[in-house]
Amino acid sequence: MTEPRWKQRYRAPSLTLPRWAPDDPEHLVYVSNLSGSWQVHAWDRAADRHRQVSDHPTGVVAGGLTPDGTRVVWFEDSKGDEVGRWLQQPFEGGEAAPLVADAEPAWSAGLALGPKGLVAVGLATRDGFSVRVGEVGGGSEELYRHDEMVDVGGLSRDGRLLVVHHAEHGDNLHPALRAFELEPMAPLADLWDGEGFGLFVASAGFSPVAGDGRVAVLADRSGRLRPAIWDPAAGRRVDLELALPGEVDVADWWPDAEALLLVHTYMGRDELSRLDLRSGALERLDHRAGSIQRAGVRPDGA
């Protein structure tokens, strides 16, 4: 007897949008429940080869790639209580090892991967929140610690700058942003809209161009999430004025950093647009109506 189509639809395997390595876009990772639980998978697009990376009883939902595409990383908790460690493994397979050797088991408070094995990891324990910076597979150094919430936001393409969310002002729901220079491991700039307003690093994060320290952020001071471009080193913020009625996220940058891929959410539907940062022109992209969990721009601009 054939299973009803509605059951087939609910039981069909799901997967996240594959994420590619910036320096090797033929190496990708995604998370899928094909095996019966959510696990991280690696995809060698050139060889048309897929491989399940993680195999944890309670599942794994967070994974990524080092920028050069040589290593897969994922967060694995030992007991299903969300306390665990980031692990890493060669893209082709092999033994899994801690991403940062001296990072204690903790709740994850964000992760950012940079060039030449650079890693910034956020840790949350009963003793507070911290951010550690080090090398993949090696040791690390504590950059920041506080009793209030902190979460890693992103690393610049060249690894010079790190942005974190923090709640030093005591409001976890409305965080502020702080930028650090990683040489010499010191605060660079702060961005806060005041009490009751939050700032967040957008999905797109930093510009994909090395040497460009601009980061896409979201602000809610208008009553809806709206994008802005923050340049911590220059001390400059540009709020992007958009004639759109709903909330807007920045999904990605175009490879030359001259345009942004926007996701506009309104009336239960998501719409993709391309915003030219030079002219301000907003172009609606053609796609099917529905909800968009994630979108990206490939290195060739597709």
Where are these regions (language model features)?
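Peripheral, non-catalytic segments that deliver or gate enzyme domains
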Residues: 2-302
